[in-house]
Amino acid sequence: MLYDTSSLMKCQVKKYSGLNFARKIRYVAPDVSSRIWYCGTSIGLTYDGLIASANFCKNRFCPTCQWRRSVKLFRQNYECFEWIKEKYPGCRFVFLTLTVRNVPIDSLSSRLVDMSAAWNRFTQRRDFKCLGLLGWLRVLEITRNSFTGSYHPHFHVVLVVPAGCWLPDHAWWLRCWQLAARDASIMFVNLRVVDGSKSSIEEVSKYVVKDSDFSGSAWVSEFPELYKALSHVRCFSPAGCWRDSRRALGFVDPDKDSLTDDVSTGGKIQDFVYLYNFKMFACIGFH
């Protein structure tokens, strides 16, 4: 097991972060605050430590659910890497980061729409199609600059390159992304070959938004706009052989995942559950 997804202690740490987050937004987004506050208050485990059942809220801003989603994606992406390497011997994985300029919160929603349209134009270009890529995985990440208060949306993409295929240089990718985004001021894209190691898989298994970016309180008044901007955005998008690998391995859409562990192959479920004690800030077992 590459990552420990069953640590009750880790759940408790993330739960504590979730309580702090919920307190901050309780006046600007009471419904979201309530969901995050009561997330993960009941957890059923197997005797070998797997999470068999839990009342996770599945909210993108919930630290507990973001952590669970991230570690499950890590394990799934690792299996996808292995499936693709076996299916297409000699293929390479290239990690591509596509950026845009930072925007204030009131422009974030329109910028995400523009980025989606830019990506479609990018992948429909004739010269892009001529690369003969086997598939890709595109992940959206949004970070917040604590000094300027601006938001930085960007795409992390893993391209699957067939054996013996030549790829253009960095300047070509930058020019194509500038044209697709219709913004000549974009000055940075990142392109590098990855090997399917732990560190490379982590890059495409990140949180959409990091709870560490919301440690202060300056962002609180912006939260309703941020929540609205991300409400109907697809953050995880596989294509080609990557989509095929997820189907073959039986993985579901990350936004629809129950976030519990797969206990269908065995593992006796304990005859008690852990309930969160808000006074002790800990999970206590009850029969």
What are these regions, as identified by a protein language model?
Residues 157:
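Cys/His-coordinated zinc-finger cores
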Residues 1-151, 161-287:
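Right-hand nucleic-acid polymerase module
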